Amino acid sequence: MNEKEISEIRRRFRADKSNITHVRGCYVNEKQEIVSQFDQPLSLLPQEECENMLSVLRRTLSGTLGKNLIEMPFTTAQVVDSDEHRLLMALRDSKLTDEEAVRMFFEKVIASYRPEGTYLILLANDTYDVPYRAKDGETLEDASENIYNYVLCTVCPVKQTKPVLGYDVPENTFHNRDIDWLVSAPQLGFLFPSFTDRSADIYSAMYYCRSASESYDEFIDAVFNREAPMPAEEQKTTFGTILGDALNDACSLDVVQTVHSRLCGMIEEHKASKDPEPLTITGRTMKTMLTACGVPGEKAEKFEKACAEQFGADAALSPRNLVETKKFEIETPEVQIRVDPEYSEWIETRYIDGAPYILIPAGAGVQVNGVPIAITRPDVEYEETVSYTHLRAHETCADL
């Protein structure tokens, strides 16, 4: 699925567009015990409650593709004959009326997902009469292309509110509000089957994870019977480790600045192009980039090999998972420097009197703990000048 296809399905989760007639739910306590189950017809809910329910479900299709939303492919063997795929198909084809399939699914989730508190499992089914889309991108609502029948699973933490004072308008008094339980934003979930090329793709599901650092291996193994993908935060850390280890003494500030700048540039260009397909790079792409930065060929090849070992041969990585476009940091055990990436090239490293320094150009507006300071040349008192702030790794911490 690409971003346009995800957005198209997200728009379904509104009261005036959805064909969701009911939502199945299972409330689980901190002991992994089922407290209650329900089958809630949306038509019987007040409009505001119906919209809130759809809003919770819709958030399972939010976030960044490749970071929070990840394709989960099924093998041909799984589609032909496997318990996990058969169960998902039973949920979809029965429109959540197969009681045995719903029970088995709830039990599978409970056995594989063990958060600290209580949580809610929601299942919804929708049938989407996909409108025809012309080559110029215009959608013809009265011309159906196919029927997309799918299920959406959402797992939400349920948190207890704290006792607070509330104002009673009719009585014009303040009272303690009772402790209540509130459904939080989805923690994980999935869409099955995927909406690929604007039609059902039973060879794939779209998995959602709110946290870029969590993987929920047991849940993924139980529901999809496959190895969990490396979380986005772990990808970033692994990428940095590979870069430093493979390049070794060739991993200079200039090289890292250039890699960061080029990856950010690729992200910006992709965003400007409005290409719905996700932006990806491979270890081979990075090898070419490193060579262009002046990295010796053998070290660039070592990097490519390490990428294949850690991420998989010819793995397609999202640049958004490898760099932070709005932050550039330099750290030592005692120093942390944060710079707007637009000005990262202002920073340089240099040896002065045999000691390594990090140099930052310091013009007007320099502050220390909120106090504006003057930087003067040693031989010129009170002279206004543009100088350099020298940071020895064990002496100073500066933020830009």
Regions found by a protein language model. Give the residues of each.
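Extended Gly/Ser/Thr-rich low-complexity repeat segments
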Residues: 366-382
